[in-house]
Regions:
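Beta-strand-rich recognition domains
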Residues: 1-20, 40-88
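Surface-exposed loop/edge segments in extracytoplasmic proteins
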Residues: 24-33, 69-74
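Beta-strand-rich interaction surfaces with strong enrichment in secreted/lumenal proteins
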Residues: 28-29, 37-41
Length: 88
C-alpha cells in the first residue's frame, strides 16, 4: 500500500469525504471538516470509490484532489448541499 493525500479546496462550508475500497466499507469518513487534507492508504492497482457530502452557501466552489491531481470539482447549488460519488 502507498500513502496519498486526499484534500479539498473550499472557502466556506462543512464536508465529509469517504474513500471506499470494497462493497462492505467500514463507514469511517477519511476527510472531515475542519481538516482540509488527510493521508489515505491505497493499492495502486485497485479501483476506489469516493463519496462526498458538502454543506455550504449557494454558489460555493469546491475542488477535491488526490496527491495534488484534481479528481472532482463542483459548485454548491441553491439547496446548500452537494453530494455525490465518483471513481478514483
Amino acid at each position: 500500500m502507498i500513502e496519498k493525500t486526499l484534500s479539498i479546496e473550499i472557502a466556506h462550508g462543512r464536508w465529509m469525504l469517504d474513500v471506499i475500497a470494497e462493497h462492505d466499507d467500514d463507514g469511517v469518513f477519511d476527510l472531515v471538516y475542519p481538516n482540509k487534507d488527510a493521508v489515505i492508504k491505497v493499492n495502486e492497482d485497485h479501483m476506489y470509490g469516493l463519496e462526498y457530502n458538502i454543506s455550504a452557501p449557494e454558489g460555493t466552489d469546491f475542488k477535491i484532489f488526490l496527491d495534488g491531481e484534481l479528481i472532482l470539482d463542483g459548485k454548491v447549488d441553491k439547496t446548500g448541499i452537494s453530494r455525490g460519488s465518483s471513481i478514483i
